[in-house]
């Protein structure tokens, strides 16, 4: 996001590099969780972030990361969200990504593809992506990453099922029709839908600038509104961007990172369950104190 919107502060560059280097495994890959296996998509994202931060391609850490990417199948086999980011940064063809026509916001609440058929945590991402996937913004970068692709970028389209199911032909045809409509939408209906999506997003922004207190809908909402032509100094976008600095940015010594979410109630609950499962007494003062704190919230 910082690269795309031109918001990277020069003083933050060393901290971001230090964080990425510190979390790289000895085998060159990055993990989704501690002690887990190297993850292809995470490794591709970290590699390109370091390249974009100014680390040379022949840096030993990037040489080992590149080798891991190729061992895991190459950037052409990354997940949908990684390819989405690469498309936004001009590193992957938008035509190989699925679309979500913003007109879906106009569906009745009980319709199968209505946003209200999704959980609240997914709904914000789903709605914001209606704009991002239809507007297909590109923020060209002066650093490429073609060395991570084992085939031409786009030969393994995002969203392609590993094992086709009985609904695959129907869904593939539906996506083809959606893409065809997205290329030539009905103007008045598209404008109505985009305005409805923008209003939906703005009405659900939290006081701290986030959407749902989690990173995905937050970032995609920023990109959605910006793709609609909203300037970064618009009050909604300014509040959203300021929120990253205020509550989500963590400085740990010489390292800098942005948290995926803030979840003290959730974390307290999970920690209490873990302690109980480990044999802690139900009358334990700490457990009772945490339960009381959760009830107070």
Where are these regions (language model features)?
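Preference for long, amphipathic alpha-helical scaffolds in soluble/luminal domains
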Residues: 1-297
């Amino acid at each position: 996001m910082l690269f795309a919107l031109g918001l990277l502060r020069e003083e933050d560059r060393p901290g971001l590099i230090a964080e990425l280097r510190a979390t790289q495994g000895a085998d060159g890959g990055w993990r989704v969780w501690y002690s887990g296996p190297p993850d292809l998509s995470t490794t591709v994202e970290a590699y390109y972030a370091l390249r974009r931060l100014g680390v040379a391609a022949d840096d030993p850490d990037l040489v080992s990361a590149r080798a891991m990417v190729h061992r895991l199948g190459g950037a052409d086999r990354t997940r949908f969200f990684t390819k989405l980011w690469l498309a936004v940064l001009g590193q992957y063809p938008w035509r190989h990504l699925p679309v979500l026509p913003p007109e879906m916001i106009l569906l009745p609440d009980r319709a199968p593809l209505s946003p209200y058929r999704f959980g609240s945590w997914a709904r914000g991402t789903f709605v914001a992506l209606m704009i991002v996937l239809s507007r297909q913004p590109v923020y060209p970068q002066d650093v490429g990453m073609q060395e991570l692709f084992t085939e031409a970028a786009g030969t393994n389209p995002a969203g392609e099922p590993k094992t086709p199911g009985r609904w695959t032909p129907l869904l593939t045809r539906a996506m083809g029709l959606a893409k065809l409509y997205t290329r030539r939408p009905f103007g008045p209906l598209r404008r109505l839908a985009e305005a409805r999506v923008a209003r939906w997003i703005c009405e659900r922004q939290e006081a701290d600038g986030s959407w749902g207190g989690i990173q995905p809908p937050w970032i995609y909402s920023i990109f959605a509104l910006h793709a609609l032509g909203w300037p970064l100094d618009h009050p909604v976008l300014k509040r959203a961007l300021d929120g990253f600095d205020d509550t989500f940015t963590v400085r740990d010594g010489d390292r800098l990172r942005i948290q995926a979410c803030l979840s003290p109630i959730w974390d307290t609950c999970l920690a209490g369950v873990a302690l109980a499962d480990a044999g802690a007494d139900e009358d334990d003062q700490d457990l009772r104190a945490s339960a009381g704190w959760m009830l107070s919230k």
